[in-house]
A protein has these predicted regions:
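A short, low-complexity linker immediately N-terminal to eukaryotic Hanks-type protein kinase catalytic domains
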Residues: 1-13
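ATP-binding glycine-rich loop module of kinase domains
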Residues: 10-71, 95-96
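Conserved hydrophobic "DFG−1" position in protein kinase catalytic cores
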Residues: 27-28, 85, 135-137
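Protein kinase-like catalytic core scaffold
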Residues: 33, 81, 142-145
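Conserved protein kinase catalytic core
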Residues: 42, 90, 151-153
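Conserved structural core of kinase catalytic domains
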Residues: 62-108
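Conserved kinase catalytic-core helix
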Residues: 95-133, 141
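C-lobe/activation-segment region of protein kinase-like
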Residues: 137-219
């Protein structure tokens, strides 16, 4: 039996969503939450501390998934957290992202950048975006498992720049498969807060698909 949030709502784990080196993730059907229960010996490097998890609970995001409520045992010991449950990940090939128009793809990707702007206001630096299993795609992209995210005292603009760079890296390698060298050149040339969405808006022809852009740019 576990206890969730300030009210001590009881939770008995039954439906396992997955497991890893840090712990197990369960489904809480009545509130549509994923509940991450960390193993007794918490890895201080890859697992969120109670203090960090509490701070993350106060950051409003939709696509960079952060803790929403903390989980405790019967003695009040912190064991994990809940987050919004997103339906099972689908293979990118199954949804054939390359056939999306760039207008549609941009509308999907810009959601990650909006969340990057939001977390930067709180001094949060996202991290570890290229590890296997750290994102979900079901028609939208979600970044999950913030175990290596960290708070920084740097200037908020500098944090935003770093977070945008991480999202750019995620999109370039996960979705575009680093096929368009011109994107890297543009990101270096424009610097600062230039995003891949900016590139797609600049370069897209009307109703062009992603595969059409790749074929046009990769000779």
């Amino acid at each position: 039996m576990y206890y969730i949030g300030d009210t001590g709502e009881t939770f008995t784990p039954e439906i396992v969503l997955g497991s890893g080196c840090e712990g197990k993730v369960y489904y809480k059907e009545d509130t549509n939450e994923a509940v991450k229960i960390q193993y007794n010996e918490i890895n201080k490097i890859t697992s969120l501390s109670e203090e960090s998890a509490l701070r993350l609970c106060n950051i409003p995001t939709n696509y960079i998934l952060l803790p929403r409520r903390l989980v405790y045992d019967e003695n009040g010991k912190y064991l994990g957290y809940t987050t919004t449950y997103i339906p099972k990940n689908k293979e990118i090939e199954e949804l054939d992202v390359q056939k999306y128009t760039l207008k549609t793809l941009t509308a999907i990707l810009i959601r990650l950048y909006k969340d990057a702007y939001e977390v930067s206001k709180y001094g949060l630096c996202i991290n570890d975006v290229l590890s296997d299993g750290n994102y979900i795609f079901n028609g939208s992209y979600y970044l999950i498992d913030p175990g290596l995210y960290y708070f920084s005292d740097k200037d908020k603009e500098e944090i935003l720049k770093e977070n945008i760079s991480k999202i750019n890296t995620f999109i370039n390698y996960t979705i575009l498969w680093d096929r368009i060298q011109e994107i890297q050149n543009k990101l270096i040339e424009r610097g600062s807060n230039y995003t891949i969405c900016d590139y797609l808006k600049d370069e897209a022809k009307e109703d062009e698909t992603l595969i059409g852009l790749i074929r046009r740019k990769v000779k």
